[in-house]
Regions:
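Short, conserved structural patches
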Residues: 2-3, 55-201
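Alpha-helical assembly-interface signal, strongest on the long, hydrophobic N-terminal helix that forms
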Residues: 1-79
């Protein structure tokens, strides 16, 4: 009986293996946090590099010697070694007459009833030459001499580690960047045309 009690006491006081058990308790949250930091760092890296690539391509394209397809290819080549498999890169280019008009509607020059919207009898500056009043008159493409070109890039990529769903996040990430550059004066900038509305379709 005494031997049995002593043996039981020795087992209860035995500390060997305690460190391993403690490590097992903290290992999962520690490695989850470590992977999260690495994933966040990768996202920041993609953001920084994609911004740098976009700025370089935009400067190169300002000479008017690059097509939209060549711009898209240059961006893809610049990010090819960086992004993961199954990632997609979307590049959007729109040209404007000047910086102040980026993303804005065409300017009304005559507002008959003063309501701030285009109505029959009103006139506006038809920046993109399509005879329609646009709330964002940007023209798809690389624009002409002295035009302002807005470049936007969207990188949709799988995360570095497929663990985001464990904490309710998406398994993919989206990184977006944009910049605007004035084209070089490689010719004469096209003048703006005033258009008057007779009827609304």
């Amino acid at each position: 009986m005494i031997k049995r009690l002593l043996k039981k006491r020795r087992i209860l006081e035995d500390q060997s293996g305690a460190t391993l058990m403690e490590f097992g308790l903290v290992a999962a949250p520690f490695f989850l946090m470590l992977l999260g930091i690495m994933d966040l760092g990768y996202r920041g890296y993609v953001d920084t590099v994609s911004k740098s690539v976009l700025h370089k391509v935009a400067r190169d394209a300002s000479t008017g010697e690059m097509t939209v397809a060549e711009i898209e290819q240059a961006v893809t080549d610049g990010l090819d070694t960086l992004i993961l498999k199954n990632a997609s890169i979307d590049v959007t280019t729109q040209s404007y007459f000047d910086f102040t008009n980026i993303g804005k509607p065409e300017k009304l020059t005559t507002d008959v009833n003063g309501n701030g919207t285009v109505d029959p009898g009103d006139c506006f500056i038809d920046n993109n030459g399509n005879d329609i009043f646009d709330t964002d008159y940007g023209i798809a493409g690389t624009g002409g001499p002295d035009d302002i070109v807005s470049y936007k890039i969207d990188v949709n990529s799988p995360r570095l580690f497929p663990l985001a769903s464990m904490i309710g996040l998406s398994d993919t990430m989206t990184v977006s960047n944009s910049t605007a550059v004035r084209n070089q004066p490689f010719g004469a900038q096209v003048d703006l045309v005033e258009t008057c509305v007779s009827t609304l379709d």
